[in-house]
């Protein structure tokens, strides 16, 4: 009887029983009246008369009047008090239930180690992401983002080479930049070591050159000197300080992203917990590009 724990189910069951009882009572009353009643009363002077059958000048039945009045009162309550002013919805109730569950989930798994986080992220990826990005996370031959390279220097190099689209920033789509691989690697090293919160690069010797190229090639025009992408308190371009972190991924999961093929939808409706959002980039960061 778990379904009785939901007050909507209880209300529906009670309403169904009331309707059933009233239907049986009214049906039996009408059947009895049809069997025992005799024609009586005055016919309406201007009423309908068809084949000798006329219309009595009777008042509207009390039951009809009561039904009409109850319907009007219910409609007034529904539109002005019950909904939408009280703002109840099944989606809202679902979100509250998921929020409560996420709090229990966070408390239960708050002390996860690195390996457990990676395993959790892998589970989330296989269920929600692998359909488009592939089991290996390589993007199914370009149909989706190659997540093996995302969040790393290789991902920045791909963006420099091919450009970026689909996040609807004020600066528009980032075009591909005509840089050779060495210069692209230098910029990627600088971004990962000095701008991104990751603060780590495989090529520390390229940081200084990468900084010069970052400023001279026009990257600061959209992303700013600090890489935050802000100009006069407006979000002009991607915030590179969050690249490779859960905050960057959270933004994509919340807003979705247009790709070369199709459109990645927003996953906001999934109501991922903070721990799940943290676990997903941990798994992605654990993946190693084939070049390595």
Swiss-Prot record:
Protein name from the UniProt record: Cbb3-type cytochrome c oxidase subunit CcoP
Q: Which residues bind heme c 2?
A: 174, 219, 222-223
The membrane-topology field of this record reads:
Multi-pass membrane protein
Question: According to its UniProt record, which protein family does this protein belong to?
Answer: Belongs to the CcoP / FixP family.
Q: Tell me the PROSITE patterns matching this sequence.
A: CYTC
Cofactor(s) demanded: heme c
Protein's cellular compartments: Cell inner membrane
Identify the pathway: Energy metabolism; oxidative phosphorylation
Residues annotated as transmembrane: 11-31, 62-82
The record lists the organism as Helicobacter pylori (Campylobacter pylori)
Gene3D superfamilies of this UniProt entry? 6.10.280.130, Cytochrome c-like domain
Sorted UniProt keywords = Cell inner membrane, Cell membrane, Electron transport, Heme, Hydrogen ion transport, Ion transport, Iron, Membrane, Metal-binding, Oxidoreductase, Repeat, Respiratory chain, Transmembrane, Transmembrane helix, Transport
| Pfam families according to UniProt | Cytochrome_CBB3, FixP_N
- Predominant location: membrane
InterPro entries in the record = CcoP_N, CcoP_N_sf, Cyt_c-like_dom, Cyt_c-like_dom_sf, Cyt_c_oxidase_cbb3_su3, Cytochrome_c_Oxidase_Subunit
Q: What job does the chain carry out?
A: C-type cytochrome. Part of the cbb3-type cytochrome c oxidase complex. CcoP subunit is required for transferring electrons from donor cytochrome c via its heme groups to CcoO subunit. From there, electrons are shuttled to the catalytic binuclear center of CcoN subunit where oxygen reduction takes place. The complex also functions as a proton pump.
């Amino acid at each position: 009887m778990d379904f009785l724990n939901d007050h909507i189910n209880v209300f529906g069951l009670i309403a169904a029983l009331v309707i059933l009882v009233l239907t049986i009572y009214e049906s039996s009353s009408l059947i009895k009246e049809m069997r025992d009643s005799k024609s009586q009363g005055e016919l309406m002077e201007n009423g309908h008369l068809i084949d000798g059958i006329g219309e009595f000048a009777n008042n509207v039945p009390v039951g009809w009047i009561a039904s009409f009045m109850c319907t009007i009162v219910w409609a007034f309550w529904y539109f002005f008090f019950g909904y939408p002013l009280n703002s109840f919805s099944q989606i809202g109730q679902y979100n509250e239930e998921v929020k409560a569950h996420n709090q229990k989930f966070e408390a239960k798994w708050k002390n996860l180690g690195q390996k457990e986080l990676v395993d959790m992220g892998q589970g989330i990826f296989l269920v929600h992401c692998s359909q488009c990005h592939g089991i290996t996370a390589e993007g199914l031959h370009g149909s989706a983002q190659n997540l093996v390279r995302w969040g790393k220097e290789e991902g920045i190099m791909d963006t420099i080479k091919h450009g970026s689209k689909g996040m609807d920033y004020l600066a528009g789509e980032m075009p591909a930049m005509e840089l050779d691989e060495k210069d692209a690697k230098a910029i990627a090293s600088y971004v990962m070591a000095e701008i991104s919160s990751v603060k780590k690069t495989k090529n520390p010797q390229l940081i200084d050159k990468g900084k010069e190229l970052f400023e001279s090639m026009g990257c600061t025009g959209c992303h700013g000197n600090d890489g935050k992408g802000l100009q006069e308190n407006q979000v002009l371009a991607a915030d590179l300080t969050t690249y490779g972190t859960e905050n960057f991924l959270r933004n994509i999961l919340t807003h979705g992203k247009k790709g070369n093929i199709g459109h990645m939808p927003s996953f906001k409706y999934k109501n991922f917990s903070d721990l799940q959002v943290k676990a997903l980039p941990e798994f992605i960061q654990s993946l190693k590009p084939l070049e390595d």
